[in-house]
Amino acid sequence: MLTLDKIYHAKFILKQVARKTDLIAAPRLCPGTDLYLKTENLQVTGSFKVRGAYYKISQLSAEERAKGVIACSAGNHAQGVALAATRMGIKSVVCMPDGAPIMKVESTKRLGAEVELVKGTYDDAHDRAVELQEQTGMTFIHPYDDELVIAGQGTIGLEILDQLPDVDAVIAVSYTHLRAHETE
């Protein structure tokens, strides 16, 4: 179960890799309101996804680390997994759809992952990653449907509260999926 304690633990672990990104005022986007943008595009991999991938991988057992990790992604999660695994000395394989942006594919390789381009869509890459996970015993690092990944990504909320304690609302948009998760 996802708890606030897990998110605080993730914040502690992520100090070694994630940048505390700025909140910048954006008055022209919505005149008459105090609107701020969280600049996660300035994160170490250009996306918030590194937060979840790094925290999840940091919590693996020695046995899981020895077997390596596998993921599927069209780019941002791929880079987060590659960076995290490489920094921790863990083998990583990322299945990416063959239509993924070449810049994301090359960046994922430079960050240390073995990339397998899969003909078709994201769903095809996901199916291939699951197949490889079953064959190899590597740990599958899901891009969003994992409480440790969510805890890592949830550290953004803690930063927002530190930077803007009187915040009224937070609107979070994710390209991959928009999900609401409840914490205790």
Regions inferred by a protein language model and the residue ranges of each:
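Conserved active-site and cofactor/substrate-binding residues in soluble primary-metabolism enzymes
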Residues: L2-D5, H9, T21-I24, T45-G52, ...
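Small/polar-residue-rich loop-to-helix segments that shape phosphate-bearing ligand pockets
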Residues: V93-V94, D98-V173
